[in-house]
Curated annotation (Swiss-Prot):
Cofactor: [4Fe-4S] cluster
CDD domains in UniProt: Radical_SAM (cd01335)
Function: Catalyzes the radical-mediated synthesis of 5-amino-5-(4-hydroxybenzyl)-6-(D-ribitylimino)-5,6-dihydrouracil from 5-amino-6-(D-ribitylamino)uracil and L-tyrosine.
Pathways per UniProt: Cofactor biosynthesis; coenzyme F0 biosynthesis
HAMAP family (alphabetical): FO_synth_sub2
EC number: 2.5.1.147
Organism the protein comes from: Methanococcus maripaludis (strain C6 / ATCC BAA-1332)
Cofactor binding comment, as recorded: Binds 1 [4Fe-4S] cluster. The cluster is coordinated with 3 cysteines and an exchangeable S-adenosyl-L-methionine.
PANTHER family found in the cross-reference section: FO SYNTHASE (COFH) (PTHR43076), LIPOYL SYNTHASE 2 (PTHR43076:SF1)
Lineage: Archaea, Methanobacteriati, Methanobacteriota, Methanomada group, Methanococci
Name of the protein described by the UniProt record: 5-amino-6-(D-ribitylamino)uracil--L-tyrosine 4-hydroxyphenyl transferase
Length: 359
């Protein structure tokens, strides 16, 4: 394998797979990814001051990796109305957040008009305190809500943008392979449907992130296939702001207790995933985010030497990783995030959702 040639050229899906399969050049792959990171984004590591608002944990979905879901009559079930969501957004804004990430479950009661009402209420209550970016509703949520409202995805996205949706999380991607999806999330949108929602979002002027969940039942070929799909979309639309690899948290996942999945990814696979992603995307998707909630502080710091250049957010309220068995907390102060970055010799800079630096 001629790794040095990979620095300059766009590598193929086949070469991407070779990198995942390789067991002899781990540190050379890491070194190449770090060199590319330095060339593309320099030594700045960005972060965002944000809050997660999950407005309900009640969901009709059947995702085998989700431990957050509750049934309507469960004692821990909750459902916030638009006014309650808006109050949480205001609290976040008052404590310095520049972004709120709003997500919920899949229910008949949640349609596009309900989502639009949330956006409207958040804007009304926060606008006198200055702008806050609303990063909300996964592709699955958008599709489900559009169907509940009798709308096309395009119509739904137009309504959401008009009511203040700034950007969307590119979650619900998991692994973009329908065979894998049929096993881990059988009722979730198909690969082609996920692509349809995000490309239409981009065409509507709504930027999205993109993600990949790994360390469950997928094989290396599925990782290469997934990254290839994301790069193709980005070349067509330019609408992805960042790529976020999501390591599978297995402890409380229903699939794990059925003995159908691995014990999550190894630390080596975590780091290799960041590195291969950087080598594959280069500056096509120039921002790669590490997740301190899923990896922990120390491995996240190491990943900053494996191609990543963003450390995510303060996450004032983060419930999903915690429910899945995450043990690294649900909030980190801005000062602690900055200290994490400084400790590895990088320069911390606050950004907004669109990756514009906040001086």
């Amino acid at each position: 394998m001629d790794l040095m040639s990979f620095k300059e050229k766009e590598i193929s899906k086949k070469e991407c797979l070779e990198l995942f399969e390789d067991t002899e050049n781990f540190f050379d792959v890491i070194k190449l990814a770090d060199s590319l990171r330095k060339d593309i984004v320099g030594d700045t590591v960005t972060y965002v001051v944000n809050a997660n608002i999950n407005f309900t944990n009640i969901c009709s979905g059947t995702c085998g990796f989700c431990a957050f879901k509750a049934e309507p009559d469960d004692s821990n079930a909750f459902f916030l109305n638009p006014n309650e969501v808006a109050k949480k957004a205001l609290e976040a804004k008052k404590t310095g957040a520049t972004e709120v990430c709003i997500q919920g479950g899949l229910l008949k009661e949640i349609d596009t008009h309900f989502q639009a009402e949330i956006l409207k209420k958040v804007k009304e209550i926060t606008e006198s305190f200055g702008k806050i970016d609303v990063h909300a509703f996964s592709p699955m949520e958008v599709k489900s809500a559009a169907e509940n409202a009798g709308l096309s995805v395009k119509e739904a996205l137009k309504i959401l943008k008009e009511n203040g949706l700034n950007s969307m999380p590119g979650t619900a991607a998991e692994i973009l392979n329908d065979k894998i999806r049929s096993e881990i999330c059988p009722t979730k949108l198909k690969t082609s449907e996920w692509i349809d929602v995000v490309t239409n979002a981009h065409k509507t002027g709504i930027k999205t992130t993109c993600t990949m969940m790994y360390g469950h039942i997928e094989e290396n070929k599925h990782l290469a296939e997934h990254l290839s799909i994301l790069r193709k979309i980005q070349k067509e639309t330019g609408g992805f702001t960042e790529f976020v690899p999501l390591t599978f948290l297995h402890e409380n996942a229903p699939l794990y207790h059925l003995d159908r999945v691995k014990n999550g990814a190894s630390g080596m696979l975590d780091l290799k995933t960041y590195a291969v992603s950087r080598i594959f995307f280069k500056d096509c998707i120039k921002n790669i985010q590490t997740s301190w909630v899923k990896l922990g502080t120390k491995l996240s710091q190491v990943s900053l030497n494996c191609g990543a250049n963003d450390i995510g957010g303060t996450l004032m309220e983060e419930s999903i990783s915690k429910a899945a068995g995450g043990s690294y907390g649900t909030y980190m102060s801005e000062e602690k995030l900055k200290d994490m970055i400084l400790a590895v010799g990088r320069t911390p800079k606050q950004r907004n959702t669109a990756y514009e630096i906040i001086e």
